[in-house]
Amino acid sequence: MAACRYCCSCLRLRPLSDGPFCLPGRDRALTQLLVRALWSSTGSRAVAVDLGNRKLEISSGKLARFADGSAVVQSGDTAVMVTAVSKTKPSPSQFMPLVVDYRQKAAAAGRIPTNYLRREIGTSDKEILTSRIIDRSIRPLFPAGYFYDTQVLCNLLAVDGVNEPDVLAINGASVALSLSDIPWNGPVGAVRIGIIDGECVVNPTRKEMSSSTLNLVVAGAPKSQIVMLEASAENILQQDFCHAIKVGVKYTQQIIQGIQQLVKETGVTKRTPQKLFTPSPEIVKHTHKLAMERLYAVFTDYEHDKVSRDEAVNKIRLDTEEQLKEKFPQADPYEIIESFNVVAKEVFRNIILNEYKRCDGRDLTSLRNVSCEVDMFKTLHGSALFQRGQTQVLCTVTFDSLESGIKSDQVITAINGIKDKNFMLHYEFPPYATNEIGKVTGLNRRELGHGALAEKALYPVIPRDFPFTIRVTSEVLESNGSSSMASACGGSLALMDSGVPISSAVAGVAIGLVTKTDPEKGEIEDYRLLTDILGIEDYNGDMDFKIAGTNKGITALQADIKLPGIPIKIVMEAIQQASVAKKEILQIMNKTISKPRTSRKENGPVVETVQVPLSKRAKFVGPGGYNLKKLQAETGVTISQVDEETFSVFAPTPSALHEARDFITEICKDDQEQQLEFGAVYTATITEIRDTGVMVKLYPNMTAVLLHNTQLDQRKIRHPTALGLEVGQEIQVKYFGRDPADGRMRLSRKVLQSPATTVVRTLNDRSSIVMGEPISQSSSNSQ
């Protein structure tokens, strides 16, 4: 029995005639899909995990039941749904085709997108960076050779502005894969750790994070193994950082236990892949005979650089593959290629494990040659060239007005809590950096991730009250490993060259790992940590552990781990080894420039505040902002209002500021008004008649001011024409200065006229004196 052909969600049963019916684009039978859907219809399963003062709720079986695996993870009122789907037919690609997408919906925050179409368009930086964190947390646990298209989608259902959704998405991906039949050696658990007043806080709220000196995301595997680390910190001490990692790993184990309990209750059975793309042992054995000695000779020839070494290895590859094709004509091309890769990787790693030597002749803890240079181009606000081995990075600093900072719209602020940002680092990796040809298009995920890491490394040392927006660009000119950490070093040098008063210099380094694993237990038997890794060491190694900071502490960390998990001990040793190397790099950088320049360069931008009296503001701005627009167009300055009488003028160069200052002085100049005497009577010329009064000028180049109807005559009038006033007529007015509240000129014609009949009353006299009339005799006698 199986479900109706026409509707997979209904529960009517009817026999299928000719075998199982398959959905379009799917290669599994509908009968298999129905078992999962019918089971889900009986109700969802859920588990709650206590994390200190927080509770993590994990559920499955209610939403997205056609997916191979789905889960909803909730903390407070923030909820994320994650689905996992994997094809059952292999992909033609020769790698693990895993796609992770994290999407934020404006509806989750109760908002409507602010773009023209009022719908989600494109992908934000936050979505890309979160997708990368999720990918790095789950990718190492897929079986080797599992080349099947797999997609993990994370959909933000609701966000309360209190609990962050990114950690929930990592846990949701773990649950979805664990509850699916997709081969995956999970689960993993993830938590965020903050340090507030010296205490570690698990999954802190958004408000708590604003006062935290650490933002650490830890993804852990069973047996207290670490799979992924991502952190930004306010230059915290190494021991505090290590303690936070240990606390994070402890709480990840509680999440893992909750997921394992849910998997046990569900009774998940993993599918058996058609094929795992691993080379035949026989072909690998023959490759050993053909290439091992030649590869050993290349990897122990310390005269090679990146280019010559790659050429030598490729020559051996071509010769070996040709002989393997003759020996094994029936073998798949992938087996031939991968057999050589396996042997090359084994030879490379054994040299490090057994001989404690690296392919460029360094020992395990040595740095490559480091050289620095600043003030590369005089016209730039700041520039630096950082060279480490064959990795070369050019960094520049540009200043602009505060108005040029990144502005977050209301939706992004509601979802992520991200507000305006006046410091940014942009990383570029052109194809020529590795002697390749490629499209030079928009930003890709890798460039965004590397730039975000370098920005995290530098942000803590940037002064918060700096009067400019700072943009650091990092262009990789040559790449042979650890270009993101070279960007942090080069960015620090460029900032000091530009005169930004950073609190301390920043340096970064990458630590690699080579392990030897027990084939039966799957545990690490032996390992070597490598300081300042090359590109080939990153490719053939098990970890890329990037850490940046000052002489005092740590500002950023990112760990890309290729193993299904590493012990805490290795992570602690890597941090210690990186700290030693970081201080050594800082000593070299200090020889080039040890502290920020005391002043910015002569061609750098300047900011000045201008006082514009309220009386001159209308003239300064001009009708419809004409004068301001003209000023900005002609001089290139940016003007923003600070308060009612103060304007901030940003000029890209001092000469532009002088030009703008002259322009402003000319606009606001009014020498004749300074000669006006308070209480004096002047002749005014009527220039315009309005319903509310007349516009008059006291002198020719004066801006006409309004003489209100109430100040035209002692009598109450509704229109100036009632007094016979005309345009061009001259009248006498008295000058009373300017109103301190709104800056308007105060004039009056009424006070110059004889007083109208009024009654003056006194508190002592019961009688009244009528002004303008003769006093009667009776009244005089009574007095």
UniProtKB/Swiss-Prot annotation:
Transit peptide: 1-46
Record-listed N6-acetyllysine modification sites: 250, 264, 285, 289
Positions where Phosphoserine occurs in the chain: 754, 782
GO molecular function terms attached to this record: 3'-5'-RNA exonuclease activity; miRNA binding; poly(G) binding; poly(U) RNA binding; polyribonucleotide nucleotidyltransferase activity
Subcellular compartments: Cytoplasm; Mitochondrion matrix; Mitochondrion intermembrane space
GO annotation, biological process: cellular response to oxidative stress; mitochondrial mRNA catabolic process; mitochondrial mRNA polyadenylation; mitochondrial RNA 3'-end processing; mitochondrial RNA 5'-end processing; mitochondrial RNA catabolic process; mitochondrion organization; mRNA catabolic process
Class in the EC hierarchy, top level: transferase
Limits of the S1 motif domain: 679-750
EC number(s) from the headed UniProt entry: 2.7.7.8
Keywords: Acetylation, Cytoplasm, Exonuclease, Hydrolase, Membrane, Mitochondrion, mRNA processing, Nuclease, Nucleotidyltransferase, Phosphoprotein, RNA-binding, Transferase, Transit peptide, Transport
UniProt membrane topology term: Peripheral membrane protein
Catalysed reaction equations from the record: RNA(n+1) + phosphate = RNA(n) + a ribonucleoside 5'-diphosphate
Modified sites of kind N6-succinyllysine: 552
Domain KH as annotated: residue spans: 605-664
CC per GO annotation: cytosol; membrane; mitochondrial degradosome; mitochondrial intermembrane space; mitochondrial matrix; mitochondrion
Domain of life of the source: Eukaryota
Described function: RNA-binding protein implicated in numerous RNA metabolic processes. Catalyzes the phosphorolysis of single-stranded polyribonucleotides processively in the 3'-to-5' direction. Mitochondrial intermembrane factor with RNA-processing exoribonulease activity. Component of the mitochondrial degradosome (mtEXO) complex, that degrades 3' overhang double-stranded RNA with a 3'-to-5' directionality in an ATP-dependent manner. Involved in the degradation of non-coding mitochondrial transcripts (MT-ncRNA) and tRNA-like molecules.
The protein's assembly and partners: Homotrimer; in free form. Homooligomer. Component of the mitochondrial degradosome (mtEXO) complex which is a heteropentamer containing 2 copies of SUPV3L1 and 3 copies of PNPT1. As part of the mitochondrial degradosome complex, interacts with GRSF1 in an RNA-dependent manner; the interaction enhances the activity of the complex. Interacts with TCL1A; the interaction has no effect on PNPT1 exonuclease activity.
PANTHER family, per database record: POLYRIBONUCLEOTIDE NUCLEOTIDYLTRANSFERASE, POLYRIBONUCLEOTIDE NUCLEOTIDYLTRANSFERASE 1, MITOCHONDRIAL
Family: Belongs to the polyribonucleotide nucleotidyltransferase family.
Protein name (record): Polyribonucleotide nucleotidyltransferase 1, mitochondrial
Source organism of the structure: Pongo abelii
Gene giving rise to this polypeptide: PNPT1
